């Protein structure tokens, strides 16, 4: 469930997890050449950070749970320019864990994507408890 977008830099008490190192998303003019986004209903690519955005930049999106008692959320970011995710580049599968048990739609999990000249980063925060959440790369390459 997507609910709100917040632009700007965020202070983090933990280092964000690297989504993509040596990313080709940034062009010579220090702007993004592709969009960074997520998959929405029907395999549609929904851009969060659009091409032409000056870097460094950050974007936060607030997610919630779809089921009662859900303790984790899967986030699959993509980069590209096509309207369908199947034609864009998947950047991995990231499991956000440690969400407190609550009725669906109650937890507020802020996921922040940051693009620097060299990297794309992801971090997550439980807005209710004001606490950073743990993120696992599903293929086991990294853990925050």
Where are these predicted regions, by residue range?
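Bacterial N-terminal signal peptides
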Residues: 1-5
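Acidic low-complexity intrinsically disordered segments
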Residues: 14-144
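Bacterial signal peptide processing site
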Residues: 9-12
